[in-house]
Amino acid sequence: MRRFPPERIICLTEETVETLYLLGQQDRIVGVSGYAVRPPEVRKQKPRVSAFTSADIPKIMALEPDLVLTFSDLQADIVSDLIRKGVTVMAYNQRDIAGILAMIRHLGAVVGAADEAEKLASDYQARLAKMADANTHKPRPKVYFEEWDEPMISGIKWVSELVEIAGGCDVFPHLSVHKAATDRFVQSTDVIKAAPDVILASWCGKKVRSEKIAARAGWQDIPAVRLDRIYEIKSPLILQPGPAALTDGLDAIERALS
């Protein structure tokens, strides 16, 4: 990186795109992930240069980025290719609410908008605290969050935390601490035994089929199935560890639990 703050940034995941827009720093963005949909205008304003685990390296290089923002080990191969070409890369790895707030503050500092980032993060913290307090004394339905269906994968830490803030009780909180999806596999019998009152599903961009969930062998007596409380939470709202999850994602969970 030869310019600081970086003037030309490429974001290979959605949450950094939304964060930069919220900070008023969108003019620094010169390329985004093909999955970036927040805010809606990003799809018309910024060229798409990647999927999630693959990227158009020549296109990225042609955009002459000062900095490329990535996420986790899942993009390690992309990161490796870019580093070999001399590109400065920053990989975030937030997996819980505290990490999301830290990412916002850190990215703000990187682009010279530390004050704006602090206000944004503080506003989110206040919002989360207010909702948690409002739900403290309400009955807490047991919630199974399904991130994928075949195999079944339970929710990651930030999702588990948001379920609790929204007034629910995650039935697999011990699994949520695992970063890798392979460590959050659950068996059908595990869910039957947990007997969730509500099932929330967000299948990583694939359309959730509630009838398919309800038809699983042995699930007919699960309270959530019996009472038809199976709800889809759209992936862009909840599976991106950034502003969307703390706002619209959280609100969607609270509506489903009410």
Where are these regions (language model features)?
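N-terminal ligand-binding lobe of clamshell/alpha-beta domains
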Residues: 1-258
